[in-house]
């Protein structure tokens, strides 16, 4: 069984360090690269693409609202044409840099508030899906499993990779437990690796209550903001491999080839 590990990278900003990015690129199969609107710059994009190419990691754009002051985490209401321009412009920024390295952007995953809003708002999800489809009909749309973006992408017969979050607990409705709650995050590496393996093997969300919600799972999103989360990410990868899972970049998975 194939599975992918992805991570948001190149997010250099006052909120986020990129010092762990080179190490993360030894763990992940696909990189979601900040395109300068919430974080990152030309130098960070070049760095992440260069290491990704060397490590066989597939390259993805991680577009956001143009809101570096809030790391793209503030909700902003824009028109459909403004959202489309937002997505297309950031894809083109990263694609032009990728081409200098003889690489291509092969997936897109929205960031922060844009992603969160589109998980619940079908009109916004439709707009994002259409924008992504307009830049390249072969591009993979990386979406949270069970989200409105998954529904929107299926309507357009897009290539869809559904992701779960390795370090987050889920509510019984399939949504992430709010960060305001004590049990939102999973910080114990042993619990995290079992949590991920169970969901991947069962193709179901493993809710905090114990409820299972059947869903499609193609990718696991990890984070590496500190040494503890780096260790958790490595533990998750090793546990997947030792249990017979085959790790692949998104664009190399049989589902998309």
State each model region's role.
Residues 68-107:
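Glycine/small-residue-rich loop that forms an oxyanion/phosphate-binding "nest" at active or ligand-binding sites
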Residues 146-204, 212-213:
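Active-site rim beta-loop-alpha module in soluble metabolic enzymes
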Residues 8, 62, 108, 222:
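Conserved, mostly hydrophobic/aromatic
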Residues 33-38, 117, 136-145:
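Catalytic beta/alpha-barrel core
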Residues 98-106, 203-216, 246-253:
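Flexible, glycine/charged-enriched surface loops at secondary-structure junctions
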Residues 139, 231-257:
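C-terminal domain-boundary segment and adjacent tail
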Residues 22-26, 47-60, 99-101:
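Acidic (Asp/Glu)-rich catalytic clusters
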Residues 17, 21, 31-38, 69-84, ...:
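Glycine-rich tight-turn/loop motif centered on a GG-T
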């Amino acid at each position: 069984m194939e599975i992918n590990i992805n991570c948001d990278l190149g997010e250099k900003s006052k909120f986020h360090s990129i010092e762990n990015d080179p190490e993360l690129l030894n763990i992940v199969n696909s990189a979601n690269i900040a395109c300068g609107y919430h974080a990152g710059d030309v130098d960070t994009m070049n760095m992440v693409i260069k290491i990704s190419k060397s490590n066989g990691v597939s390259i993805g754009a991680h577009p956001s609202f143009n809101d570096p002051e809030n790391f793209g985490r503030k909700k902003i209401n824009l028109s459909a044409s403004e959202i489309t321009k937002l997505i297309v412009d950031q894809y083109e920024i990263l694609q032009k840099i990728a081409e200098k390295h003889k690489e291509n952007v092969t997936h897109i995953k929205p960031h922060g508030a844009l992603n969160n809003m589109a998980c619940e708002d079908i009109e916004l999800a439709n707009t994002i899906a259409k924008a992504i489809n307009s830049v390249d009909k072969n591009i993979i749309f990386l979406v949270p499993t069970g989200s409105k973006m998954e529904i929107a992408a299926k309507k357009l017969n897009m290539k869809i990779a559904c992701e779960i979050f390795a370090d987050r607990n889920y509510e019984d409705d399939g949504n992430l437990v709010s960060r305001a709650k004590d049990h939102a995050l999973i910080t114990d590496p042993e619990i995290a690796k079992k949590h991920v393996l169970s969901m991947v093997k069962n193709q179901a969300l493993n809710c905090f209550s114990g409820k299972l919600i059947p869903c499609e799972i193609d990718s696991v999103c990890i984070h590496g903001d500190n040494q503890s989360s780096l260790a958790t990410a490595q533990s998750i990868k090793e546990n997947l491999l030792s249990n017979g899972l085959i790790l692949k970049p998104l664009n190399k998975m049989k589902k998309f080839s």
